[in-house]
Curated annotation (Swiss-Prot):
It comes from Hippopotamus amphibius (Hippopotamus). One of its GO terms (biological process) is ATP synthesis coupled electron transport. Binds a dinuclear copper A center per subunit. This is Cytochrome c oxidase subunit 2. Its EC number is 7.1.1.9.
Amino acid sequence: MAYPLQLGFQDAVSPIMEELLYFHDHTLMIVFLISSLVLYIITLMLTTKLTHTNTMNAQEVETVWTILPAIILILIALPSLRILYMMDEINNPSLTVKTMGHQWYWSYEYTDYEDLNFDSYMVPTSDLKPGDLRLLEVDNRVVLPMDVTVRMLISSEDVLHSWAVPSLGLKTDAIPGRLNQTTLMSTRPGLFYGQCSEICGSNHSFMPIVLELVPLQTFEKWTASLL
């Protein structure tokens, strides 16, 4: 989860989020090197007393500033495309959960089980217990097994929403009349928080998401207790 004054991303708990963090560092390094080079050139231009007014043609320079940016763009595009394909790839999910956005709560349905569905509302500030997080706690958490591939089907009953859990690298739009899908897999158990990330009305800020990732045996006991 996020902390006050945090400047970086949340800790990654999924392979996709780890790849996104690596890509962020990779891209940031390239941007830093380019910015340093530009600043160095500007400094030289402002401090040097040498002038050259007879330059009419510089074929070598034009070649360099054409080829070098192309190489840099390729170095950015290749890992980006790799991650995009990884995020879209869905192979034999072990569990499917359907998520519907409403104004202003989420509803969940475990499609592999009969009659296993519930609504998830934010817990009001007046009902919070010691240790609970304001504006992030819900009355019904989404319990999922860790170390397995889970497919999320996401849509909306009314207006545009967006189902986002940053620590898992997830952000998928919930669009009325359209069913979007994404996958998640957590490498460790715990509670992971998210929120609606598409402005959807006056109570947009009060649509938290809480995923509780547990071992498979614990998940099976939880489902058995509800059926």
